[in-house]
Amino acid sequence: MQTMTIKEAENVLKEIMNEEDDRFQLLMKDDRKGVQKLVLKWYKQKELEQKEKEKFFEMSKYENALREKGVTYIAGIDEVGRGPLAGPVVTAAVVLPEDFYIPGLNDSKKLSEAKRERFYDEIKVQAIAIGVGIVSPQVIDDINIYQATKQAMLDAVANLSCTPQHLLIDAMKLPTPIPQTSIIKGDAKSVSISAASIIAKVTRDRMMKELGGKYPEYGFEQHMGYGTKQHLEAIEVHGVLDEHRKSFAPIKDMIQK
């Protein structure tokens, strides 16, 4: 084992699943600092994987409780874009299979963009059904953001390719006969809602990036329509667009001047 290079040791550790592996026992006895650093890194990685597994199991408790009652099609529902000054509110409804597993799944806001994009692709592959609901700034202005969010959620459910038997919703109640559970901070407590959060977030971010290409002076691809200093200054200089929510302050005040 002493003749193994550090790079070879690194590759071997990638294959090792547990400490009982004979190769791991040999590497443990290798006193080179480089090898011992790799062994420590392996331990930390396994510890992280275990924590992610425990977190995922904890986030599956709502789904598991429903499945024990014979419920198969459980739709997690979440929204993105209630607060911005521009762009639509986007919701997603996601029905996951019982064997669904993506370690590290969490509220989309707590994930890096790269991780969100990767999870988005994985959810698309694994999900039984995905529905998306999009409500425009004009409708938001007409019926208010709360009602628009509810409408987008109902649209997302209607756009599913299967009929859900139960809805798990992030902090909302929907006017539908489908049984539902409203969960405060559900995107961090339910794998289905978390998956919906990621689908909605990536979908909306892509729309706002397209808007950024159409109106480069507003920087939508950077702030996603939120009321940042850059965005407010752009509105002052270039004016209010159709994509802006005219019922939202300070845009409402700008129009009334």
Curated annotation (Swiss-Prot):
InterPro entries: RNase_HII, RNase_HII/HIII, RNase_HII/HIII_dom, RNaseH-like_sf, RNaseH_sf. Keywords: Cytoplasm, Endonuclease, Hydrolase, Manganese, Metal-binding, Nuclease. Its EC number is 3.1.26.4. GO terms for biological process: DNA replication, removal of RNA primer; mismatch repair. Endonuclease that specifically degrades the RNA of RNA-DNA hybrids. A divalent metal cation binds at residues 78-79, 170. Its main location: cytoplasm. Manganese or magnesium. Binds 1 divalent metal ion per monomer in the absence of substrate. May bind a second metal ion after substrate binding. The keyword Ubl conjugation does not apply. One of its GO terms (cellular component) is ribonuclease H2 complex. This is Ribonuclease HII.
